[in-house]
Amino acid sequence: MAMTYHLDVVSAEQQMFSGLVEKIQVTGSEGELGIYPGHAPLLTAIKPGMIRIVKQHGHEEFIYLSGGILEVQSGNVTVLADTAIRGQDLDEARAMEAKRKAEEHISSSHGDVDYAQASAELAKAIAQLRVIELTKKAM
């Protein structure tokens, strides 16, 4: 039997996941993180993107995170997300439209603030589309 630890993924609205997992993959403030059983204690910011959860027996789940905090303690990992949406609950058409609008804003931006905001919106839309794609593959 594979080693596991307890994971909680919580957003401001609801608890998205609570259970035993083999590992997770998430984008922290310093880059990609893979959290396995026995990981050293850690507290870091999470960038907008996805969390890949590998549950017991290898089943995968993908959740879009708009950002938040990751806390790793002995045998327990907690993700406090600003917003969390399961892959199957994301609207692909809406994400495609958000991506298109962000690309338009980038091409027509007239300043650093406009460009930075449009870039952030583009990153969110791309992350949502990636979560949708991976969720479809996992089904």
UniProtKB/Swiss-Prot annotation:
The keyword Cytoplasm does not apply. GO terms for molecular function: ATP binding; proton-transporting ATP synthase activity, rotational mechanism. It comes from the Bacteria. It is a peripheral membrane protein. The lineage of its organism: Bacteria, Pseudomonadati, Pseudomonadota, Gammaproteobacteria, Enterobacterales. Produces ATP from ADP in the presence of a proton gradient across the membrane. This is ATP synthase epsilon chain. GO terms for cellular component: plasma membrane; proton-transporting ATP synthase complex. Disulfide bonds: none annotated. Signal peptide: none annotated. It comes from Shigella boydii serotype 18 (strain CDC 3083-94 / BS512). Belongs to the ATPase epsilon chain family. Keywords: ATP synthesis, Cell inner membrane, Cell membrane, CF(1), Hydrogen ion transport, Ion transport, Membrane, Transport. Pfam families: ATP-synt_DE, ATP-synt_DE_N. F-type ATPases have 2 components, CF(1) - the catalytic core - and CF(0) - the membrane proton channel. CF(1) has five subunits: alpha(3), beta(3), gamma(1), delta(1), epsilon(1). CF(0) has three main subunits: a, b and c. SUPFAM superfamilies: Epsilon subunit of F1F0-ATP synthase C-terminal domain, Epsilon subunit of F1F0-ATP synthase N-terminal domain. InterPro entries: ATP_F1_dsu/esu_C_sf, ATP_synth_F1_dsu/esu, ATP_synth_F1_dsu/esu_N, ATP_synth_F1_esu_C, ATPsynth_dsu/esu_N. It is found in: Cell inner membrane. Its main location: membrane.
